[in-house]
Amino acid sequence: MGRLVQAFKFKPFSRKQKKILTWWLPESQVHEMNGIIADGAIRSGKTVSMALSFVMWSMETFSGENFGMAGKTIGAFRRNVLKPLKLILFARGYRFKDHRADNLLEVSRNGVTNYYYIFGGKDERSQDLVQGITLAGFFFDEVALMPESFVNQATARCSVEGSKWWFNCNPDKPKHWFKVNWIDQAAEKNLIYLHFTMDDNLSLSETIKERYRRQFVGVFFKRFIQGLWVAAEGLVHPQFADKAKAYAISSVSYTHLTLP
C-alpha cells in the first residue's frame, strides 16, 4: 500500500457533492440511472467527490470486478486524482495496493476487493488500450480533453450487469463532441447531469473565490468561472471594446525612446 505521510483533512460536502456521493444508493430515486455527468467551473469540487463516489459505489456493489479510470494522461490522473483519492480512501478505512508497473489500483475493504485500471486518453490511438477488457464501470476525469473514440471504446467495455459511468470536465466550445453527444443527450442516455460553480466547493474561502473571479475575463471568465460552454470567437476580451477609451493611447512621445 505504501506509506501515507499526510492525513486527509475533510471539509464539509456541499449539497451537489452530496448528490454525487449518494445518487447510486438503493434508497435514492435515481439509483437506476446509467451514470452521472458533472461539469462546470474550475475549483468547484467536482473531481474529488466524483472519484470518491465512483470507488464507494463500486466497492458497495461489486466484488472481484475490473473498473477503468482515465485522465488525459496517466501522469495527470495520478497527480490530480489518484494522489488525493488514496488519502481519502485510507482515512475511510479502505486498503489498497498501487501496482504502478501495471497502472492498476487494487482496493479492499471488509472482505471486498476490486481492481481499477488507469488509462490515459490523450489521442486517437488511446482507444486501443481499452480494447478487449471487460469492465463494471468507468470514471473519466477531464473527459472533454479526450478524443471521442477513446470514450466510445471505454464506455463500450462496460458490459457487466449494473455497470455505470462517471464523467467530469470543465467546459469547452458549445459544439464540442461531449457537449453535443452526452450532455445535450443526458436524458436520452439516462444520465444525471449536475452543473458546478465555485460556490459548490465549501473548502474555498471567499477571498480565494474572488481572486479567481478577478483573474479571468471574457470567454475565459465564462468558461472557467461560470462554467459555460461558450465559443472563443469574436470578442475574447470584450472589456476592451466596452471601455475603448480607457485602453486607448492618445499620443506617444518618440523623442525619449531608446532603440536597441
Residues covered by each model-derived region:
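Conserved P-loop
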Residues: 35-100
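Inter-Walker segment of RecA-like/P-loop motor cores
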Residues: 83-133
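Pre-P-loop entry segment of helicase/translocase ATPase cores
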Residues: 1-34
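Residue-level preference for the first positions of well-ordered beta-strands
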Residues: 35-37, 66-68, 116, 137, ...
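ASCE P-loop NTPase helicase motor core
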Residues: 137, 145-215
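Walker B catalytic acidic pair
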Residues: 142
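Conserved beta-strand scaffold positions in the cores of enzyme catalytic domains, especially
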Residues: 69, 118, 193-195
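ATPase catalytic-site recognition across NTP-hydrolyzing enzymes
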Residues: 201-257
